Design a protein with these regions (language model features):
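Active-site acidic catalytic loop and adjacent metal/ATP-binding pocket
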Residues: 35-42, 54, 126, 176-225, ...
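Histidine/acidic-rich helix-loop-helix segments that form or flank divalent-metal centers
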Residues: 259-268
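Conserved N-terminal boundary motif of the eukaryotic protein kinase catalytic domain
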Residues: 22-27
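ATP-binding pocket architecture of kinase catalytic cores
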Residues: 30, 34, 39-150, 156-160, ...
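Secondary-structure capping and boundary motifs in well-ordered enzyme cores
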Residues: 115, 143, 187, 192, ...
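ATP/Mg2+ or Mg2+-diphosphate-binding catalytic cores
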Residues: 283-346
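An alpha-helical support segment within catalytic cores of ATP-dependent transferases
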Residues: 9-10, 14-17, 131-137, 143, ...
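Active-site activation/catalytic loop segments of kinase-like enzymes and analogous catalytic loops
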Residues: 150-159, 221-258, 272-292, 304-312
Length: 346
């Protein structure tokens, strides 16, 4: 941060919090996959000490949408950090301080069943919302395909230095069409887009608060539950995933989002949606490394590939496009990945 930026933030914070600039201190606590930065702001006066979160977000980061979605979720009584003040021109957002306990951290010592139950209840509450068309765009075929194409553009071509060939392109095209058809079968609703262990904060008991929702969209009903249960940052055995997934499916049935006979379809949608998400992540993590100088994400590529391997093995017999993709991937891309410095295996 430049000294000029630091001064601008200090002035804005003092004005927002109605205190002197000398009362305010700030400490960087997090950055994420985007250019946004988060600071814990401490205000010390004669009467008391308070803390807040300052989000500094460039104009490229959907700032208007952040405010719009925040207002929508708040009005629906969904637990998100309180937005105390926002300046879209400066890219400054003053938020409630929810503490340091992320969902991921809580899982290291707490009861996973209790935490996942809370996260899935919150997700069901979101899925029950009626989203006005004016607020969110649709996760249509074009957007899903654009995400999938990040994989050949950044993972295959750049991270693995693979040369495009007609056979590989044809296999990927058929595979993509199969995944898009599975997405189109599903009921659509609010999609957070990154509903995972790093974007949930744990509050009192097992209550969870949701952050990082500015990329929300209207899309397939299984997208967010895949993000949570097939999390890149914490891996659970499939039996445990399915136990939580079945409980979530029952919640959706109870609120009328799904029929009582929809479990087999829901399970298939879940796994196939996971394929779309994880193939996309191969490209996204490669782009973060090569374009944005954030190489740490590459250490999670083996986990992503293992999720892809598992789903392809489950559905390869039913969908030839899935079997063909894994055969091609295993023969061409996987050996290159396993030789890379960032690949540690599982």
């Amino acid at each position: 941060m430049s000294s000029q930026d630091f001064v601008a933030e200090k002035v804005w914070l003092a004005e927002s919090l109605r205190c002197d600039e000398t009362d305010v201190s700030q400490q960087l606590i997090a950055g994420d996959a985007s250019p946004r930065k988060f600071y814990r702001v401490t205000v010390v006066t004669q009467d008391r000490t308070t803390t807040h979160i300052l989000m500094v977000s460039p104009p490229t980061e959907n700032n208007e949408k952040f405010v719009l979605v925040h207002g929508f979720l708040t009005a629906a009584d969904i637990c998100v950090p309180r937005l105390k003040r926002a300046d879209l021109d400066l890219g400054f957002f003053l938020l409630e301080d929810l503490g340091d306990l992320t969902f991921w951290m809580a899982l290291q010592t707490g009861d996973p069943d209790a935490f996942y139950s809370a996260a899935l209840r919150a997700l069901c509450d979101i899925q029950a919302l009626d989203v006005p068309p004016s607020i969110l765009s649709i996760y249509d075929d074009a957007e899903l395909q654009r995400e999938l194409d990040v994989c050949p553009d950044w993972f295959f071509a750049k991270a693995l230095s693979m040369t495009a060939d007609g056979q590989g392109e044809a296999v990927f095209k058929r595979f993509s069409e199969c995944l898009l058809s599975m997405a189109a079968e599903q009921p659509f609703g609010f999609v957070h887009r990154d509903y995972h262990s790093r974007n949930l904060m744990v509050r009192e008991e097992h209550d969870v608060a949701i952050i990082d929702f500015q990329d929300a969209i209207v899309g397939p009903i299984t997208y967010d539950v895949v993000s949570l249960l097939k999390d890149v940052y914490i891996v659970w055995p499939r039996a445990r995933q399915l136990s939580w997934l079945k409980a979530y499916w029952q919640l959706l049935v109870n609120v009328g989002r799904l029929s009582t006979h929809s479990w087999p379809d829901f399970l298939r949608w879940y796994d196939m949606m996971g394929l779309q998400r994880h193939v996309k992540i191969l490209g996204v993590f490669s782009r973060l490394w090569l374009r944005d100088q954030k190489p740490a994400y590459m250490q999670d590529i083996p986990v992503v590939i293992d999720y892809i391997r598992e789903a392809c093995s489950l559905y390869g017999e039913e969908y030839s496009a899935v079997a063909d993709f894994w055969q091609w991937f295993e023969q061409t891309a996987l050996p290159r990945a396993q030789r890379a410095d960032w690949y540690t295996g599982l």
